[in-house]
Amino acid sequence: MSGHSKWSTIKRKKGALDAKRNKIFTKLIREITIAAKIGGGDIESNPRLRVAVNKAKVANMPKDNIEKAIKKGIGGNEGVEYFEITYEAYAPYGVALMIKCLTDNKNRTSSDVKSVLAKGGGSLGTPGSVSYMFYRKGLIVYNLEKYLEDEIMEFALEVGAEDILVSNNEAEVITSPDDFDKVLSFLKTKFKEEVAEIALIPENKISLNKDQAEKIILLVEKLEDFDDVQEVIHNLEIPEELS
């Protein structure tokens, strides 16, 4: 159960994460607001909101910020209207990208994404050109510097996880989307997760050398620097020296 690296966004060094905390919070607040607007403000009956709030808690967002974002979402159609867009794209060396956006201006976002892709040697794909390479799964990630791999594996499989993947001091618990809440709720009684979300999982990962992988990482980071871009999912197998 090894040989995989992180499924979701590329991991940044702590200093860079701290420097971008406000940007991260802005994106999380936007996601919480949209989730509450679409499905209501009750976390128990709104799975998307539940996942968004959990992400915010993992990122140490203050409770007050979370509550304000929910109230803003259930306040109706006041203020800016956001649209959800997912762009399918290719990075250099055949790496596939799924670029998830929340935007109040589709034309601006499309132009920005195309520009960064072009400068980074990538290109925008047509609908369906990349999405077939990914499938939806529940993802719960634990830091193995805090917990024992065997304990996580035992409890996760007991409660119905599909798989546990270990790489780079992390254990990734994979579930079906339907079992995600059940597995997460049980594991929360034992461990504190680093990530918990319904994620797009690549069917296969592409292995590149260090220099090539760095080029992909830089492109992903430039895309994620845009406020409109919520997340970039890729199928790059990140070399251990870069993780």
From Swiss-Prot:
One of its GO terms (biological process) is regulation of DNA-templated transcription. GO terms for cellular component: cytosol. It is found in: Cytoplasm. Keywords: Cytoplasm, DNA-binding, Transcription, Transcription regulation. Pfam families: TACO1_YebC_N (PF20772), Transcrip_reg (PF01709). It comes from the Bacteria. GO terms for molecular function: DNA binding. Gene3D superfamilies: 1.10.10.200, 3.30.70.980. Belongs to the TACO1 family. HAMAP family: Transcrip_reg_TACO1. This is Probable transcriptional regulatory protein BB_0025. The lineage of its organism: Bacteria, Pseudomonadati, Spirochaetota, Spirochaetia, Spirochaetales.
